[in-house]
Amino acid sequence: MAMRLAAAAAFVRRLVPARNPVISAEAEAVTCGRGDKKTKRGKRFKGSYGNARPKREKKIERIKDRVEVPRSTPWPLPFKLI
């Protein structure tokens, strides 16, 4: 019985490729940091701009475009202000 288990284990080891744990851990570490171009930190690292890191002029435009609603306005907002 032990001989069969050893033979089966050897057979399974040949079928399943061995994984290198260092490579898989490295790939997971890059997904949300300096190497990820979709995050603000990644954009700063690469020196690029985009949705996560807009240029200064775009930021100022967005702030100016916001509608300031006075406190006396009833909630929900009237259709004209939306």
UniProtKB/Swiss-Prot annotation:
Annotated segments matching region Disordered: 34-56
Gene Ontology terms: biological process: plastid translation
UniProt entry keywords in alphabetical sequence: Mitochondrion, Ribonucleoprotein, Ribosomal protein, Transit peptide
UniProt family annotation: Belongs to the bacterial ribosomal protein bTHX family.
InterPro entries, per database record: Ribosomal_bTHX/bTHXc/bTHXm, Ribosomal_bTHXc/bTHXc_plant
GO cellular component: mitochondrion; plastid; ribonucleoprotein complex; ribosome
Residue ranges that the Swiss-Prot or TrEMBL entry lists as coiled coil: none
Compartments it resides in: Mitochondrion
Domain of life: Eukaryota
Pfam families registered for this protein in UniProt: RPS31
Organism whose genome encodes this protein: Oryza sativa subsp. japonica
Stated name of the protein: Small ribosomal subunit protein bTHXm
Biased composition annotated in UniProt, kind: Basic residues: 37-46
Transit peptide endpoints, chain numbering: 1-22
Main location: mitochondrion
